Amino acid sequence: MRKVYIFDTTLRDGEQTPGVSLTVEEKVEIAKQLAKLNVDVIEAGFPIASEGEFKAVKKIATEVEDPTIAALARAVEKDIDRAGEALRNAEKNRIHTFIATSPIHMKYKLRKEPEEVKKLAVKAVEHATKYTEDVEFSAEDATRSDWDFLVEVYEAVIDAGATVINVPDTVGYATPEEFYELVRYLRRNISNIKGVQISVHCHDDLGLAVANSLSAIRAGADQVEVTVNGIGERAGNAALEEVIVALDVRRDFYKVKTDVNLKEIARTSKLVSHLTGIEVPPNKAIVGGNAFAHESGIHQDGVLKERTTYEIIDPKKLGFSGSKIVLGKHSGRHAFRKKLEELGYSLTEEHLERAFKKFKDIADRKRWITDTDIEAIIQEELTKSNGKLKVEIIHVTSGKVSTATVRISMNGEERIEVAWFKNGPIDALFSAINKALGEEFKLREYRVSSVTSGKDSLGEVLVRVEVNGEIFVGRGLSTDIIEASA
């Protein structure tokens, strides 16, 4: 089966993400993790950019083994010299040089004619071969370049010693169909392509970076350039984890393989997110917090019976602990019962039904239902009295004068009372309940605690009252402490 080479540019293009600036030690730490991930090439940086960048590339070249260590350089001799110096200690090194080839770049940025651009490209590759036998050449903005001119340039740099020719979709302009045709055209029309790798480098401006990369692989690309979590300039680059997992899961379709250690994907994603400060969106494919989470009752029931009903990837294969059953307002009894079993509870059907009803009521008001929330619901259910007194409706307003309206059923008989006090909504509520019951009770203790954190957290209220010399204790649980108090 044909192998696709993975060229990781997290430390170069990925670090160009606005707001990201990694220290030398942080870059080395990421590079070592990329080596554990077993990528083929690590683009460590752009040595001419700064002294810190040079030191980072040099340190990675010295300390990181196994992958080829690459450094970027413009088609300028001083850039290439700096890259060659930084890579001197690498076990395997590569100089990656580039120049723009699109009409708009040649006219407005370079202010050079196509023939002059081609000569500069050849000169750069020839100079790079003085430092290494492994030279990659990129035709910047290839997808907006003339295809025949691309063929001319690539043939010339291959003759000059390039071992890899890269086809960048620099501004994320291509569509999968166009990019497939371009790569196939280059494969068929570059006369000296034999023995030379075709690489692709896709940006995500139209959200097509991964799709374009996969299309290029189908068209015969040998190498794909990616970043962890898809970070990078503007909208980012093709996401390493998405490309690799797609090739693995759909090997039947793409008919290629990589040497990447899938077990390290989760750890690599978390490390890059932590060190760059770029949080992974919850709905991000493969590595997002919700990628293997299920809230829908139908989906939860299916996954609990057979994981593959709603999961095409085993999260454990990627280094995650497993699937997540997220309890929320869409969850069903099967998932709720399963969660109780995980927490060590075994309820009767009657208790389960009441607890599930309480759970659904809370889930309608609370975004996230945590294990602590579930335990609080169960504790309330297990300690609840089966008395004949029930608070049906509560309405409380607060201001200079607080008022409370309650509807209480006792032995099937409804009683409604209204009270208002200046001392606040809780005082008004207790007075209304007092009047509705026709009993004079004294409040001996009132305590509110938060079960979980957050603005929609569950509040647990403990009330201790004295009636005719007897002490009664009640507990309430709700996202509304007024309701919990009743």
Curated annotation (Swiss-Prot):
Q: What is its EC number?
A: 2.3.3.13
Which keywords appear in this protein's UniProt record, sorted alphabetically? Amino-acid biosynthesis, Branched-chain amino acid biosynthesis, Cytoplasm, Leucine biosynthesis, Manganese, Metal-binding, Transferase
Gene Ontology CC annotation, any one: cytoplasm
Where does this one sit in the cell?
A: Cytoplasm
Essential cofactor(s):
Mn(2+)
Q: Where does Mn(2+) bind?
A: D13, H201, H203, N237
- Superkingdom is Archaea
**Function according to Swiss-Prot or TrEMBL:** Catalyzes the condensation of the acetyl group of acetyl-CoA with 3-methyl-2-oxobutanoate (2-ketoisovalerate) to form 3-carboxy-3-hydroxy-4-methylpentanoate (2-isopropylmalate).
Similarity annotation: Belongs to the alpha-IPM synthase/homocitrate synthase family. LeuA type 1 subfamily.
Report what the protein is called. 2-isopropylmalate synthase
> What species was this sequence derived from?
Pyrococcus abyssi (strain GE5 / Orsay)
Q: Which gene encodes it?
A: leuA
